[in-house]
Amino acid sequence: YKTEPDETMENRSIPYPRGKTLGGSSSINGLLYIRGQEQDYDVWRQLGNKGWSWNDVLPYFIKAENQERGGDEFHGIGGPLSVSDQRIKLPILDAFMNAAEEVGIPKVNDFNKGDNYGCGYFQVTEQNGLRCSAAVGYLNPIKNRKNLKIETKCHVEKINFENKKAVSVSYW
């Protein structure tokens, strides 16, 4: 994928890679784990999207995590996605964060509490030094189930439900 040409960038378009692989874009991204701003979720809810306020989605974020720091009101343990602090701290980044703080930009120790305005080290989806993508966290543990067939190079047209339970997909 590419962005549309933009006249403010001399009509350039920018490559925008997407994860057409098991695990989706979590298999190709920079490993950063960030949920987004609380106020953005609340605006989605205010626009009529029931179930999308910060307080509505927070329990699902907590359930998804296996947070290295431990569980609390914002983080969970025992979930399928391993979330940890970055192992490498770079002096140049520390200097940048100190400079940002000097001009009034706060340091942030946890970008996943709903207010991620500021500067700091992001957490990553990593386990034992390896990427913990959605495929690693969710698919690998169940990939040998007899009732699961993994298909690649397919396009899903529809998720089929019985009552409120997804039971299959229609694809080509």
Task: Locate predicted features.
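N-terminal glycine-rich phosphate/pyrophosphate-binding loop and immediately adjacent elements
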Residues: 1-62, 170-171
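Conserved redox-cofactor binding core of oxidoreductases
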Residues: 45-166, 172
